Amino acid sequence: MSDFPLYALSEEHQAIREAVRSVCDAKVAPYAADVDENARYPREAAEALQAADFHAPHVPEEYGGAGADALATVLVIEEVARACVSASLIPAVNKLGSLPVMLSGSEELKKHYLG
């Protein structure tokens, strides 16, 4: 490993990673095997991510989201995947599905679907 890192996460991004990891280790990982073995929706993960506001971190603050940048959103997805790959689709699909509304939706649609 080099003494001169070409890239390092900012303190803010490190804090996000640690916070997501903590939630996932405690509330997502314990159910991962059961989710996979029974091919079921990761309800426990969805509830934990929503309670911690990690289910859709990219949603702008004016609609009740965290307004996370792309790197923070990827860090959330990565940490959730570390605990349960199936559950990582929750923030990933929220990002993918909400992007058209964020980019082209009317204010009414944004308030309804993002808020």
Model features per residue range: what roles?
Residues 28-115:
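Glycine-rich flavin
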